[in-house]
Amino acid sequence: MKFNRCFGCMEEIQGYPCPHCGFDPRSVKGIEYALPMGTILAGKYLVGRVLGQGGFGITYVGWDIALERKVAIKEYYPSGQVSRNPGSRGLTWYTSVQSQQAKQNGTQIFLKEARKMSKVDDIPNVVRVRDLFQENETAYIVMDFVEGETLKARLEKTGPLPWEQAKGIFLPAIQAMEQVHQAGLVHRDISPDNLMLTPDGKVKILDLGAAKDLSVNNGASSMQVAKGGFSPFEQYTQRGSSGPWTDVYAMAATVYYTLTGK
């Protein structure tokens, strides 16, 4: 099945480079262990370029073939526990006992905790989840694609922002974070690359793929998530208990980084 869509922006094209975004896969060095561009998932999602990656997942731009709309696709890819041969789709899980346990439990935890995100679908400043499924020995979350640039990308261009400008970003983000907590969830991955600034001046909290249901195990999670410089101490230990304080710390660290560049 062939689709005349740019793997960078998913607009219709006749050839590369893309006249809309300039993307050309022939001149871009991709991530070797990522899904090949052009992969079809669940029979209905076209996979494009990598948007970002973290300790437990890879996010791709995608196209919903049936509904004809752009989406973001998050793949469960726990660093240090799996590998993928270049050009292939399936994952190879390492043979250690720890990795085998992750294979059995990790994808289910990923999907179970992702389902909790449906609780916050009505929060305007949080990206919506559209689909969940398993394939290629792993799991996937399909989310709305949010146009714009991340706070991280903005700061790379502008440098630190004054508070008068930064508060227009953080006040809505903090209010959205509070609503997430009221729904019984903690995000656990607040950082400059998970705050999206849209062309119309709004802010969206991205990537609730690490979200934790606070009603389960007193906030403890078997999915360890940490981001240097932004995650609090409890996220660096498997016995750490996450709560609203986890996101408060990460949001405060993000504010500090935005104001100082450090």
Where are the predicted features?
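Activation segment signature within eukaryotic-like protein kinase domains
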Residues: I169-F170
